[in-house]
Regions:
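Extracytoplasmic
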Residues: 47-49, 67-69, 84-88, 153-155
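Structured domain cores in non-transmembrane regions
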Residues: 75-118
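Generic structural detector for well-ordered beta-strands
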Residues: 51-53, 92, 159
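Extracytoplasmic/periplasmic terminal helices and flexible tails
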Residues: 102-103, 112-184
């Protein structure tokens, strides 16, 4: 109650211009976050499902209790080519929707076969001075105490935008076991 009274007294002391500027900034922040939420929800609802094979997981991240560092096998090919950042990786999907590396491209309009997709990747700096490539998310957060379920994760399930200006954008849905079933 006391803080509410102080808050109202501070608002009364503010000029109308200051109040407008603060309100406009708050509105811009809310619009920014709202736009990003809508964009990510669109990727999840309209994106095409792809499974990316995971490289062996760093066990230290499991010991922290609530997240797992993800490294996708497809990124091994990008490392080998010393690729630029924020470009596209062409992958071919097998019958189980598992992605296999084909090539790299700078062109979002490149002609693709029916079973191929573009995945947007980015080059990130490591905390230890190195670099790594990411596709979608590079970590998976889960409820504390449930780490044992995710030790057997073999694939990351992602949704990928296949057309428009966001082509190749990926959102992580969850992790799958060796049978390609989503771990819940």
């Amino acid at each position: 109650l006391f803080t509410t009274i102080l808050f109202h007294q501070q608002i009364k002391k503010m000029s109308k211009l200051k109040l407008f500027i603060i309100s406009a900034n708050m509105l811009l922040v809310l619009l920014f976050f709202g736009f990003n939420i809508v964009k990510n929800e669109k990727v999840l609802s309209e994106g095409e499902t792809v499974l990316l094979e995971l490289r062996p997981v760093d066990p230290r991240s499991l010991m922290q209790g609530d997240y797992m560092t993800l490294h996708y096998e497809v990124c091994n090919h990008i490392y080998g080519l010393e690729a630029e950042s924020n470009k596209f990786c062409v992958v071919r999907l097998d019958d189980d929707r598992v992605a296999h590396f084909v090539s790299l491209t700078n062109d979002a309009t490149v002609a693709l076969r029916e079973d191929e997709l573009l995945l947007r990747y980015s080059l990130e700096k490591s905390r230890w001075g190195g670099k790594f490539y990411t596709i979608g998310s590079d970590s998976y957060f889960f409820q504390e105490g449930t780490a044992i379920k995710y030790v057997t994760a073999t694939y990351g399930m992602l949704k990928v935008v296949t057309k428009g200006e966001m082509i190749g954008t990926c959102s992580l849905v969850g992790l799958c076991d060796e049978n390609k079933k989503l771990i819940e």
